[in-house]
Swiss-Prot record:
Keyword Repeat: yes
GO aspect biological process, one term: hair cycle
Cited InterPro entries: Ankyrin_rpt, Ankyrin_rpt-contain_sf, iASPP, SH3-like_dom_sf, SH3_domain, SH3_iASPP
Location of Omega-N-methylarginine modifications: R137, R142, R144, R160, R167, R180, R205
UniProtKB keywords: Acetylation, ANK repeat, Apoptosis, Cytoplasm, Methylation, Nucleus, Phosphoprotein, Repeat, Repressor, SH3 domain, Transcription, Transcription regulation
Gene that this sequence comes from: Ppp1r13l
Modified residues (Phosphothreonine): T123, T275, T307, T340
ANK repeats: 655-684, 688-717
Protein's name according to its UniProt entry: RelA-associated inhibitor
Modified residues (N-acetylmethionine): M1
One example GO MF annotation: identical protein binding
Organism of this sequence: Mus musculus
Length: 824
């Protein structure tokens, strides 16, 4: 009984539905007849207006007027009724399933229809809860209906495949797209001309077919100009629907007229009417870098000015319609609205162009300047390698710039520091106005060394050093000057670099690079510069000449050399070794040296008298200065001797630079191996946060990177200036980039996966929250999860039976083994 009653009720409901549907079809037929009559009347009026002109121009020129009249018609005909391209029966079926807005009887039957497809931009008002099942993709940044809208057939794929054959010949695709893909924030559609291209979410593979077809305007049903994708004004959209129905009207004359109106000339006129207001804001052309430039200059500050892939389209009101997508894109790490997409989403076949909109930091480019470009600006012969091929011996002198390199006048840096060393020297130096040739080699060096970093011009020491050497051509050729430490040197740019437009950006990047890289960047110079002879054992020869007897130079030579070198080295070393300068000139020698110098030329030293029972203290160079300089120049024996005299081989200078930094930047592999074996800290950062691994990565030196990683280098250590890891410092414009970047990427991926997820703590860490783990240096931690959405910098790990979050940048793939070396 229940089933029979249910069947009876269902039949009754079907009958009621059919009767109401027939009534609705009759209503639609009446509306259609009214529209046809109005069309006939308007056609007659247009024919009477254009009777004086030839027929074809009249037919073509009549289209805009007809479109305007239809768009402003007071008859309550909406998109579904006026633009229906189907037959009468088909239109009735469409109307039964919710194609009309004007029929008030639509609402009681909308819940019964699972195929409701509203076509108005304001359709969310009429949607019932049941219809959301097929329209839940409306707010999506990738509406499916839009893919079909740009297809060659001009067909919008329906959520239900059964309705497809009925809607196949219809040209009302743009309005289905407006209906289904319209966001609840769709009110800006009527404010002005705009391109209704959705700002897609950051998908790595956006569908290219729909955009390519629309971008090239190759659709056969969209007219010659692709007018269906022009800014969607309602008048234009209504005329688009009424302009190209294949078979909708019964009047054959009107059919022929409408077929003529769909020619190219009519579409051109329509483009002139509707696309000109939109052209200043957005050019509907295939995507180019200039499109983004145009957008940046139009004053749309809220637009994302990033370099988008080729398949992306941009809308002037993209942030209004897709603000959620924009916020998601901005949350991916960009500093502001001008940030770029992540590197993995950028097209690899194109170099991204910098946007023209003002940047927050007023920097003209989005990605950092490669080191090779900076090296090229520092040295005009970087590409040719002329300096390295011609200049022999140790590279310390080959790094010297020509005397007239800086734009500042060179005599002033030489003459200003003259009063500085005089008060520090003993009376013996003040009483010697006339000095022989060897003093001319050492005195200017002392002047440059005693200058404070604030007074230093770009590398004035080398500049001061070269000028007297050229003047003293008759001096002893065996005299070898002591090489300078890179710790006090500043970057110097050649004259041709002044014409580079990115000079300010280069200077900013240079200020963030550690001194060893700056020093390494000026290695090769012009071979035409006259340089003094170079030798491998420079330090040993200097020490032998200073502290051992031999009959080469006169008595006046060693006297200024001794005091000057000592004071210069101690001034360079600064606070670490303040004691040696005081006892170097004993009280007795200064009393005897002023009268003895003009009288007797037999004296070879001022340290002690011949036959003196007291053994005078010898001058001693700071081992830190020796270590830093020898590590850069590649003198392993000097490095070994200096390390023996130091407690810590990783002792930094005032800028945090260690001997390991210098050895890596100088590509001195034996010294790197020796320092690591001696217990040097492979994670010692300088004042900019650059670890030795950053320096090795910037040189694309895979061998040194491997050695550092295997001895406990921190893979995820970041710099202070830009927060970059080692892999981000690899130079893509230099040889070895692929190998070095691949190795570092493999190491990053292996962290927490290799060795059963075991990583080794490189520093101590105290937990700040309850879900974190505390650990000490050297402890092994097992990583349990590292790919969570909130675990980019924190990994879930276990230690001593407890689980919690640990910072990934505190760990290395291998432990750092400290050498048990005792001081000698």
């Amino acid at each position: 009984m229940d089933s029979e009653a249910f069947q009876h009720a269902r039949d009754l409901l079907d009958l009621n539905f059919q009767s109401l549907a027939m009534k609705h079809m009759d209503l639609k037929q009446m509306e259609l007849d009214t529209a046809a009559a109005k069309v006939d009347e308007l056609t007659k009026q247009l024919e009477s207006l254009w009777s004086d002109s030839p027929a074809p121009p009249g037919a073509q020129a009549g289209v805009p007027s007809r479109m305007a009249r239809y768009s402003t018609s007071p008859v309550p005909e909406h998109f579904g009724s006026r633009g229906s391209p189907q037959k009468i029966a088909t239109d009735g079926i469409e109307a039964r399933f919710g194609r009309s807005e004007s029929a008030p009887s639509l609402h009681p039957y909308s819940p019964l229809s699972p195929k409701g497809r509203p076509s108005s931009p304001r359709t969310p008002i009429y949607l019932q809860p049941d219809t959301y099942s097929s329209l839940d993709r409306a707010p999506s940044p990738r509406p499916r209906a839009f893919d079909g809208a740009g297809s060659p057939h001009g067909r919008a794929p329906s959520p239900r495949p059964g309705i497809g054959p009925v809607r196949q010949p219809g040209p009302s695709t743009p309005f289905d797209y407006l209906g289904r893909a319209g966001s609840p924030r769709g009110s800006p559609l009527a404010e002005g001309p705009q391109a209704f291209f959705p700002e897609r979410g950051p998908s790595p593979r956006p569908p290219a077919a729909a955009y390519d077809t629309a971008g090239t305007f190759g659709s056969p049903l969209l007219g010659a100009g692709g007018s269906a994708f022009t800014p969607p004004l309602r008048a234009q959209d209504d005329s688009t629907l009424r302009r190209r129905p294949p078979k909708a009207w019964n009047e054959s004359d009107l059919d022929v007229a409408y077929e003529k109106k769909s020619s190219q000339t009519a579409s051109y006129e329509r483009l002139d009417v509707f696309t000109r207001p939109a052209s200043p804001g957005l050019q509907l052309l295939p995507w180019r870098e200039s499109s983004l430039d145009g957008l940046g200059a139009s004053g749309k500050d809220h637009l994302t000015s990033a370099t988008l892939p080729r398949n992306y389209k941009v809308s002037p009101l993209a942030s209004d319609r897709r603000s959620d997508v924009g916020s998601y894109r901005r949350s991916l790490g960009s500093a502001g609205p001008s940030g770029t997409l992540p590197r993995s989403w950028q097209p690899v076949s194109r170099i991204p162009m910098p946007p023209s909109s003002p940047q927050p930091r007023s920097t003209p480019r989005q990605r950092p300047i490669p080191l090779s470009m900076i090296f090229k600006l520092q040295n005009a012969f970087w590409e040719h390698g002329a300096g390295r091929a011609v200049l022999p011996g140790s590279p310390i002198f080959s790094r010297a710039p020509p005397p007239k390199l800086p734009p500042q006048p060179p005599p002033q840096p030489q003459m200003q520091p003259q009063p500085q060393p005089q008060p520090q020297m003993q009376p013996q130096s003040q009483a010697q106005p006339q000095t022989p040739a060897p003093q001319q080699t050492w005195s200017p060096m002392n002047e440059g060394l005693l200058k404070s970093p604030a007074e230093l011009e770009p590398e004035p020491e080398l500049e001061v050093l070269l000028a007297p050497v050229e003047e003293a051509g008759d001096a002893d050729e065996g005299t070898v000057t002591r090489p300078l430490s890179p710790t006090r040197l500043q970057p110097a740019l050649p004259p041709e670099a002044q014409t580079v437009p990115e000079l300010e950006e280069v200077a900013r990047v240079l200020a963030e690079i550690p001194r060893p890289l700056k020093r390494r960047g000026s290695m090769e110079q012009s071979p035409a510069v006259a340089l003094p002879p170079t030798h491998k054992k420079q330090y040993q020869q200097i020490i032998n000449r200073l502290f051992h007897r031999h009959g080469g130079p006169g008595p006046g030579g060693p006297e200024p050399e001794l005091s000057t070198i000592t004071e210069g080295s101690e001034a360079r070393a600064g606070p670490p070794a303040p004691a040696p300068p005081a006892p170097i000139p004993p009280p007795a020698p200064p009393q005897s040296s002023p009268p003895e110098q003009p009288q007797s030329m037999e004296m070879r030293s001022v340290l002690r008298k011949v036959g003196s029972p007291r053994k005078a203290r010898r001058a001693r160079l700071n081992p830190l200065v020796l270590l830093l300089d020898a590590a850069l120049t590649g003198e392993l024996d000097v490095v070994q001797q200096a390390v023996k005299e130091m407690n810590d081989p990783s002792q930094p200078n005032e800028e945090g630079i260690t001997a390991l930094h210098n050895a890596i930047c100088g590509a001195n592999y034996p010294i790197v191996d020796f320092l690591i074996a001696a217990g040097a800290n492979v994670n010692s950062p300088d004042s900019h946060g650059w670890t030795p691994l950053h320096c090795a990565a910037s040189c694309n030196d895979t061998a040194i990177c491997t050695a550092l990683v295997q001895h406990g280098a921190a893979i995820f250590a970041t710099t202070l200036s830009d927060g970059a890891t080692a892999i981000e410092k690899c130079d893509p414009y230099r040889e070895g980039y692929a190998d070095c970047a691949t190795y570092l990427a493999d190491v990053e991926q292996s962290m927490g996966l290799m060795h059963n997820g075991v990583v080794y703590a490189l520093w101590d860490y105290s937990a700040e929250f309850g879900d974190e783990l505390s650990f000490r240096e050297g402890e092994s931690v097992t990583v349990l999860r590292r790919d969570g959405p909130e675990e980019t910098d924190w990994w879930w790990a276990s230690l001593h039976g407890q689980e919690g979050y640990v910072p990934r940048n505190y760990f290395g793939l291998f432990p750092r083994v400290k050498s048990q070396r005792s001081k000698i």
